[in-house]
Structure formats: structure tokens, C-alpha cells
Amino acid sequence: MTSTAKSSRSSTRNPGAAAVALAATVALLAACAGCSSSSDNESDPLSGDKAGGDNVVVGSNNFAESILIADIYGEALKAKGIKVTYKPNIGSRETTYGLLKNGSLSVLPEYNGALLAYLDAKATPKTVATTTAAINAKLDSKLKLLDPAPAQDKDSVTVNAATAKKYHLTSESSIADLKDVAPDLVIGASPEFQTRQQGLVGLKSVYGLNFKSFKALDAGGPLTQAALKKNTVQAADLFTTDPTITKEKFVVLKDPKNLFGFENVQPLVYKSGLSQKGADTLNAVSAKLDTVALLKMDAEVQLQNKDPLDVAKAWLTSAGLLPDLVRADELLRVLGGELQV
């Protein structure tokens, strides 16, 4: 418990002290309300007509990790006094990119390699920096990529334990090793996977794979996981941070031709929907979000069934991005109640 919380509890025996504390807190909050003045957004290339960039709509795609990262972004922004509205679980990139372009969304968690494949299927960048540069060359002028996080989560071709055993596949095997056996395998993934370069199109053109059939499921979620476990599909597109891979002894095949590219987590924003303060906040999040932390949080959400919002807040606090204090509104409520004790 913080010293703030301790002092507020001890004041129950001294109503006068509680009144002073409450008055001081109200004064402090009033002063802080003026800390984010309109001057903060002057000459700000990211701020615009949408409440000065301080009324932010954070969206997410239709899978668990995207929702989790959106919660991380949103709670970090809220801690800086920015009003946040969540629009979770919207759908695929084909939908959310358009919503960003028209300003319906302000912020969206993205994966740089997949975004580039969507914008330019022929691009073959060799580094994170060249990936970002290639995206910027194709990105709509109303949008902006912020800093990439060290955290990566790639699409993959993953097989179940039975398939791995049957065809002698291990974690050292590659997607290319499926060429002769793919005609016997059903692959499952999101509906969009069927027509994406980072999907069946690329698996055929880059690796020469022709699967027996394709089963439309979800984006690496419970439907795909269950189908792979039950052998309804023998191969699937799972995200490499998916905790069920280890739990179910699935085998992720290597991607030596880099079809799935770099997949750093990276905020994509609508320029007029986010202030510089908001951009700086998200860049601070990206600086601390690594793959180890993302794996841990994914396991908490997907295996332990924890609320992603709670998981997001806990990580932000541990990373020093949320104040380890009682929230001001909670403090006022506590102090206000204690005045009546």
C-alpha cells in the first residue's frame, strides 16, 4: 500500500485532518486540470480538430492480443489525462485500416510486417527500419506510424503433434519441408488468410505449397487452436506468442524465406486524432514492451482467463508507466467517505 493510501486511512480518527486533505487534493486536481492547456497542441503535427487530440478512440482487431495491447495503449493514455474510448474486437485489417483513414479510430495496435504486406505485397525489407520506411512510403497521408516495440508476434505455419510425428517435423523444420505433404493437409486460419500474401498466396508463390483444402476459422484464436488440437486441420496460422503452442506441443515451422517478415508491435495512429503528448506516451510504452512481457501477458489472458484490462494495468504499473498510487477519483471517494465516519 502506498503512503497516500496509508495516510488517508489514518485520518479516520481526525475529521479535521481529513477535511484538510480533501481540500488539498481537490486543489491539486484543479491545478492539474490546467496542466494540459491548448498551448500543448500548438504547432503539433499530430494534433488536430478532434478535441485537440485529447479525445482518443483506441480500436483493436479481432484477436486477443490486439485487444490486450489496445488496453495497454488506452490505459497509458488515460494516465496522462487523455480521454479514451475503446472500440475492441472490430475485425480484420481490411476493416480497421479504413476506419483509421476516415478518423473513426485514433489509435490501433499494428504489426509492421503484416501491415506492409497489406500495403505492398511485393516489398521484401531486411530490417525493422527498412520495414518502417517501406510502410511510410505507402501509408495514407492521414496516418502515422509511431515507434516500434521490441516485442514481436509473427504469423506462422504451425502443425499439431500428430502431424509433426507423422512427417518427422521438429522445431528445426521449415515451411519448405511441407512441400511434398501439403496436398494431404488441411490448413486453417482466418478467412483473410486465403487471399493474403502473408497467407495462402505467399505460401504458394514463395514456398510452392498447395494444401488439400483451406478451412476458414478465426485469427489465431480459440477456433483455430481447437481445430488444430482435434486434428480437424493439420496445419494452422497461429501467432508465435500464442501460449497454447507450448501447452499443446504444437510445432512452429521456421520461415527461412521470411514470408511473414518482421512483426514488431507498432502503434498506427490517425494524425488528427492524437496529440503529441499522446504520441510520446505511446512511444514510451513501445520502448518497454518486449516479447517476454507480451508472452507472459498473453498467457495470463488466454490460459488463466484474466481480464485483459487488469493485465494491461498491472504491466503498465510494473513498467513504471502508471503511477503506483491510488487514482485521484478513488482518493476523493475514500476521503469523502471518511469525513462522515
Q: Where is each model-derived feature located?
A:
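Ligand-binding cleft/hinge of the Venus flytrap
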Residues: Y73-K80, S173-S213, A314-S318
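Bacterial lipoprotein signal-peptidase II cleavage site
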Residues: C32-L46
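Short, well-ordered beta-strand elements
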Residues: G52-E65, I82-N89, P183-G188
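Periplasmic-binding protein-like
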Residues: K142-L143, A149-D155, D242-S286
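A conserved helix-loop-strand patch within extracytoplasmic ligand-binding domains
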Residues: V128-V186, S275, A287-T291
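Ligand-binding "clamshell"
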Residues: L119-L146, T232, T244-K257
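Short beta-strand-to-loop elements that line the ligand-binding cleft
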Residues: V84-G91, F211-A219
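Short helices/loops that flank or line small-molecule/ion binding pockets
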Residues: D71, E75-A76, E94-L105, V201-V206, ...
